């Protein structure tokens, strides 16, 4: 039986940066570094680390099923026109990758798309996901669009609530 996914959309021109910047600041003052894969270096080693982080964080997605092999992941997520390392926000605690927020470039369709946002279990509940999404909101501007879209399984209530807090609204596309 097919599940009706929750479709959400954000108009970045309405995004309240002043409201969410404190999440970014809190990460920085607590020693969490926010960066992008582009700034860190889009290397084979970093792509492998991104895969491992994505795999770990995806385990909690309702009805996710088995995660891709690295080769499948690379083919489906990296070797595609929508991939841009500037859209991959990373949260680092020292050298340890603890969170990711990957957004793909769909500017040809008039938007960017939040593919995955996740934080390792031991670092959850500290606002890191909100900080990463806030830090990465400028990617839409880099791509020349003002719309960010995402989808969620309806049982992924925490992700849906976080996005709605950020200003995402239900969409019918």
Residue ranges and their predicted role:
Residues 1-4, 130, 154-172:
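Conserved active-site alpha-helix within GNAT-family acetyltransferase domains
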Residues 1-42:
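Acyl-donor-binding surface of acyltransferase catalytic domains
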Residues 47-54, 73, 77, 133:
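Hydrophobic alpha-helical core bundles mediating ligand binding, dimerization, or RNAP-core interactions
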Residues 58-121:
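A conserved beta-strand-loop-helix scaffold within acyl/acetyltransferase catalytic domains
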Residues 120-124, 150-160:
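Conserved beta-strand-loop-alpha-helix junction that forms the acyl-donor binding cleft
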Residues 123, 127-135:
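Conserved acetyl-CoA pyrophosphate-binding loop and the N-cap/start of the following alpha-helix
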Residues 127, 144, 156:
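Conserved G/P- and acidic residue-centered "switch" motifs that form tight phosphate/ATP-binding loops
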Residues 140-152:
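Conserved GNAT acetyl-CoA-binding A-motif
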């Amino acid at each position: 039986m097919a599940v009706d996914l929750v479709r959400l959309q954000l108009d970045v021109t309405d995004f309240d940066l002043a409201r969410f910047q404190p999440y970014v600041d809190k990460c920085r003052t607590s020693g969490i570094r926010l960066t992008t894969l582009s700034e860190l270096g889009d290397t084979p080693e970093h792509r492998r680390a991104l895969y491992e982080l994505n795999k770990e964080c995806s385990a909690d997605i309702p009805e996710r099923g088995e995660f891709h092999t690295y080769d499948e992941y690379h083919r489906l997520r990296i070797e595609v026109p929508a991939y841009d390392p500037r859209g991959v926000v990373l949260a680092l605690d020292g050298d340890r990758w603890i969170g990711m927020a990957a957004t793909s470039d769909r500017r040809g369709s008039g938007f960017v798309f939040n593919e995955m946002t996740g934080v390792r279990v031991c670092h959850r509940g500290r606002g890191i996901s909100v900080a990463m999404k806030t830090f990465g909101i400028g990617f839409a501007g880099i791509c020349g669009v003002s719309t960010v879209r995402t989808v969620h399984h309806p049982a992924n209530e925490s992700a849906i609530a976080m996005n709605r807090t950020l200003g995402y609204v239900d969409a019918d596309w």
